[in-house]
């Protein structure tokens, strides 16, 4: 998920994303995504994308650690320009490792289905 966040320079104050936590100026409403995201990064400089985007993609395509990724873009950073290296835009193929099923488990499931009177299969979910 890509969402807007507070201003990195903190000049516009208050903004919608801020919550009433006067002890910590870094807390925003987007922090609510931290507990449910496998990867969370607040983009407060344009060059942060050079590391954050590949990390987010790696997390989302790793079968062991996969999960949602959240990139929270500070509003003023969204309007900044940055001279990204050309190779950053080279198309990439993200290959997802697919572990093979355990042959014993496949045999057990096949036996259970064959022995069932009215088998029902709910598939999906990884």
Enumerate the predicted regions with their spans:
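N-terminal alpha/beta PP-like core and its mobile active-site loop of ThDP/TPP-dependent enzymes
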Residues: 1-126
């Amino acid at each position: 998920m890509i969402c807007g966040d507070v201003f990195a320079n903190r000049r516009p104050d208050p903004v919608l994303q801020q919550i009433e936590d006067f002890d910590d100026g870094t807390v925003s409403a987007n922090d609510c995504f931290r507990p449910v995201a496998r990867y969370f990064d607040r983009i407060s400089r344009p060059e942060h994308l050079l590391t954050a985007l590949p990390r987010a993609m790696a997390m989302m395509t790793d079968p062991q650690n996969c999960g949602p990724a959240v990139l929270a873009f500070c509003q003023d950073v969204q309007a900044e320009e940055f001279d990204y290296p050309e190779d950053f835009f080279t198309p990439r193929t993200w290959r997802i490792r697919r572990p093979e099923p355990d042959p014993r488990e496949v045999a057990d499931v096949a036996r259970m289905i064959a022995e069932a009177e009215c088998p029902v299969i709910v598939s999906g979910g990884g």
